[in-house]
């Protein structure tokens, strides 16, 4: 097993329903340590840059509009195989297809408002963490 860092973004639907603590409980109970966390409103430019890999997809504009519709919570998570572990506890992208006991099954409202984003690879994790956090913001 390898200790890894991964990125997580709690989406506006969770913040609006005051469920941040509940999401953090899922993450911590799964064995992930929150080593950085901050709340902010993403600008349209930040959202477009962050989701640039989806720019050509039909859902890009609605994704940017949704993710900028309210505050998000940005996180750096640490743990053994943190990327896979986070993806597992998040559940399938579509809450209707997610397994019972996952964040998206229990809290997700739709494919877009599915409560949480998590890095899907080591390269993505590095890029996404660097996009939002300086090294000094990550507390061991």
Curated annotation (Swiss-Prot):
SUPFAM superfamilies: Nucleoside diphosphate kinase, NDK
InterPro entries in the cross-refs: NDK-like_dom (IPR034907), NDK-like_dom_sf (IPR036850), Nucleoside_diP_kinase (IPR001564), Nucleoside_diP_kinase_AS (IPR023005)
Domain of life of the source: Bacteria
GO molecular function: ATP binding; metal ion binding; nucleoside diphosphate kinase activity
Matches recorded under NCBIfam families: PRK00668.1
Quaternary state and interactors: Homotetramer.
Family membership: Belongs to the NDK family.
Class of enzymatic activity (EC top level): transferase
HAMAP family cross-referenced by the UniProt entry: NDP_kinase
Subcellular location: Cytoplasm
Protein name: Nucleoside diphosphate kinase
Keywords: ATP-binding, Cytoplasm, Kinase, Magnesium, Metal-binding, Nucleotide metabolism, Nucleotide-binding, Phosphoprotein, Transferase
Reaction catalysed by this enzyme: a 2'-deoxyribonucleoside 5'-diphosphate + ATP = a 2'-deoxyribonucleoside 5'-triphosphate + ADP; a ribonucleoside 5'-diphosphate + ATP = a ribonucleoside 5'-triphosphate + ADP
Organism: Rickettsia prowazekii (strain Madrid E)
């Amino acid at each position: 097993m390898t200790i890894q860092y991964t990125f997580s973004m709690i989406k506006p639907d969770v913040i609006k329903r005051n469920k941040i603590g509940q999401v953090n409980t899922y993450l911590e109970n799964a064995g992930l340590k929150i080593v950085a966390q901050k709340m902010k409103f993403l600008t349209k430019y930040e959202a477009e840059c962050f989701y640039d890999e989806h720019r050509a997809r039909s859902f890009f504009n609605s994704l940017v509009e949704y993710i900028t519709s309210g505050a998000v919570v940005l996180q750096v998570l640490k743990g053994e195989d943190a990327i896979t572990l986070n993806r597992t506890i998040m559940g399938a992208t579509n809450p209707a297809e997610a397994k019972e006991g996952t964040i998206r099954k229990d809290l997700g409202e739709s494919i877009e408002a599915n409560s949480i984003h998590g890095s899907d690879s080591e390269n993505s994790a590095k890029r996404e963490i660097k996009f939002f956090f300086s090294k000094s913001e990550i507390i061991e």
